[in-house]
Amino acid sequence: MSSHEGGKKKALKQPKKQAKEMDEEEKAFKQKQKEEQKKLEVLKAKVVGKGPLATGGIKKSGKK
């Protein structure tokens, strides 16, 4: 009987590459993303306090 190995020979996950030095552009981009995220969180907090702006869902008519 021949031995049959199942699965893949190669590892599924590639080894992590060394963290390269970030360029100034990359640093600026990440900083901008963080600022945008903070702004969104502040806006979400304000909206939660006010309640629903529009009631969605099924509209019921007064007729029976």
UniProtKB/Swiss-Prot annotation:
Pfam families: TMA7 (PF09072). InterPro entries: TMA7. Residues 27-38 have a biased composition (Basic and acidic residues). Residues 1-38 are annotated as: Disordered. Belongs to the TMA7 family. This is Translation machinery-associated protein 7B. It comes from Homo sapiens. The lineage of its organism: Eukaryota, Metazoa, Chordata, Craniata, Vertebrata. The gene is TMA7B.
